[in-house]
Amino acid sequence: MRILLAAAECAPMIKVGGMGDVVGSLPPSLIKLGHDVRVIIPGYGKLWSLLEVSNEPVFRANTMGTDFAVYKAKHPIHNYVIYLVGHPTFDSDQIYGGENEDWRFTFFASATAEFAWNYWKPQVLHCHDWHTGMIPVWMHQDPEISTVFTIHNLKYQGPWRWKLEKMTWCPWYMHGDHTMAAAMLYADRVNAVSPTYADEIKTHEYGESLEGLLNYISGKLRGILNGIDLDEWNPAKDPVLPAKFSIKNLENRLENKKILQREMGLEVNSKKYLLGMVSRLVDQKGVDLLLQVSRRLLAYTDSQIAVLGTGDRYLESGLWQLALDYPGRFSVFLTYDDSLSRLIYGGSDAFLMPSRFEPCGISQLLAMRYGSIPIVRRVGGLVDTVLPHDPENNIGTGFCFDRFEPIDFYTSLVRSWEAFRHKDSWELLQKRAMSQEFSWQRSALEYEVMYKDVCGIKEPSPDVAEVEKFSYGQSADPSLKKV
């Protein structure tokens, strides 16, 4: 099949959240299944120097009253085709925000539609979040192009209908109060990025006022869990890690822990319990819970906490104050640094994700891959990927709590601290976490089944049987399922 993915991000070149990981990593797995998969993204300023871009555009057109050109490039790691929509509105490296954000992405969606109609016509046009939400509306009456719409984060819903009508063409048949609603109505299939999130968004608590619509379209809604690139994220080969390690030589992790402690200004002591967090510092990620429990945790235990990220000013200020009050025990770097993030994954003992909501989450997968035990709230994709630690039966991969309350989070932290003191049991827990299988293999097979379904390909796919062989997060080493 010919499949075109349209999105605002594509890792590793241009990435803010999980969408970038999906758009960057899903195509290689689909290509291995025999499909012609390409990606189209806005031509942000830095991409022209990061990628080898064609000298001449492959397509020119006019939409929304302005000219644009599409250039051809190759993904720097996986070598599949990427198309860049060239226009002055994308010259900045800023992806989101700004006064013209609504116009920029509506224009990108319109340019993508023109490109798909007139240059490279896919059988499936796979759209991601509201930025491409008008594409399913425009493609609704085209029998040759089927559309799939992926919800990465329901909270961001795009411009309202009245604003869209001032910017672009809204077909006579279009319904929906805003871009996100219209996309879900008119896409041939809709998926969320985890099975649990697909169920949650049909409820009032997580539906962001769209739960009625989501229940209405539930027949075409499903959840497909994200994966990670196991070659890119491999602690045995990661060039950033000072000490490489695997399940067979976990003792090497201690060197990373000491270097992490030194780099973040913590007391260098491998026996201390080191908690890490790499996150946008926003309410969604539960940073306010961390602020509420940190002082009590540091008073009661000998724990250390290392935080990396940027976000809301008041949360940054709270974390900064904790670092001032607890030198050597609490450290925060208010930036994003890929090398330091990998060191946190590969050197911390446990990883914090006390999220209010979490459509899928990638960080917990990376943490487990690198032997850092996730401490998570049981919500969204965290339910599907982290199994509660049961020391009596030696099963589970992390520590979980249900209510978004400080006492629940604090209890999980203390339980994990106590478990860390039992070194043999903790090492088995690390090995179970590291052996979980979260590659893109299963996700790609599930997307393939959905693509064939939406295109009306009725013959049995051999890949359907393959899907049944895998369960989310199954152990890559059967001997470690119950150690």
Swiss-Prot record:
CDD domains: GT5_Glycogen_synthase_DULL1-like. It catalyses: [(1->4)-alpha-D-glucosyl](n) + ADP-alpha-D-glucose = [(1->4)-alpha-D-glucosyl](n+1) + ADP + H(+). It comes from the Bacteria. Its EC number is 2.4.1.21. It holds the Pfam family Glyco_transf_5. ADP-alpha-D-glucose binds at K15. Keywords: Glycogen biosynthesis, Glycosyltransferase, Transferase. SUPFAM superfamilies: UDP-Glycosyltransferase/glycogen phosphorylase. GO terms for biological process: glycogen biosynthetic process. GO terms for molecular function: alpha-1,4-glucan glucosyltransferase (ADP-glucose donor) activity; alpha-1,4-glucan glucosyltransferase (UDP-glucose donor) activity. Pathway: Glycan biosynthesis; glycogen biosynthesis. Belongs to the glycosyltransferase 1 family. Bacterial/plant glycogen synthase subfamily. Synthesizes alpha-1,4-glucan chains using ADP-glucose. This is Glycogen synthase.
